[in-house]
Amino acid sequence: MAESPKINRREHILQCLAQMLETSPGQRITTAKLAAEVGVSEAALYRHFPSKARMFEGLIEFIEDAILSRLNIIMDEEKDTMTRCQLVLHLLLVFSERNPGISRVLNGDALLGENERLRSRIDVLFAKIETHIKQILREKTLREGVGFNIDEAILANLLLAFAEGRISQFVRSEFKQKPTQHFDEQWTFIQQQLLRS
């Protein structure tokens, strides 16, 4: 008799939570609703996660691992400043588009009314991404001998705000307005402006 593959219950709970965030935009996810979606009791949920905040932390850990590991690959493999910036922004937008429910965590929508430390972790994640972008922009001077007329920190903040805005539009439109829509044309314009500065 063949054994059915063992389900990793923690991962299954997180997948269901992400799915509920996608299919129930604007609604608060309760542990009772999540337990029903997973097909277990609330007590069973708490055997895997001591609190709902820990469930959201599990999603945030997935976000951090996925984005930061890929960001490090971009930093290692690509040396051109503009291409690096483009790839970092594209990474954020594609990740958001492929994970609509998780986009609600990224923009803070799903964290309203939840533990403050969850929003703080997302803030820290975006601060790390902004630091990477700032580093990319600062390395332009070292690599090419030419910098920008505007402080790199200001430019990094502008680029990250662009990506965050696209993610927010995606969430606000209930996942209809794709973050990557018109990205190539928008990036061409942004790049032209950056190279002028």
UniProtKB/Swiss-Prot annotation:
GO cellular component: bacterial nucleoid; cytoplasm
Protein location: Cytoplasm, Nucleoid
Keyword Cell cycle: yes
Stretches that traverse the bilayer: none
Regions recorded as binding DNA: 30-49
Protein family according to the UniProt entry: Belongs to the nucleoid occlusion factor SlmA family.
Biological role: Required for nucleoid occlusion (NO) phenomenon, which prevents Z-ring formation and cell division over the nucleoid. Acts as a DNA-associated cell division inhibitor that binds simultaneously chromosomal DNA and FtsZ, and disrupts the assembly of FtsZ polymers. SlmA-DNA-binding sequences (SBS) are dispersed on non-Ter regions of the chromosome, preventing FtsZ polymerization at these regions.
Subunit architecture: Homodimer. Interacts with FtsZ.
UniProt-recorded name of the protein: Nucleoid occlusion factor SlmA
Biological source species: Shewanella frigidimarina (strain NCIMB 400)
Taxonomic lineage of the native organism: Bacteria, Pseudomonadati, Pseudomonadota, Gammaproteobacteria, Alteromonadales
Gene giving rise to this polypeptide: slmA
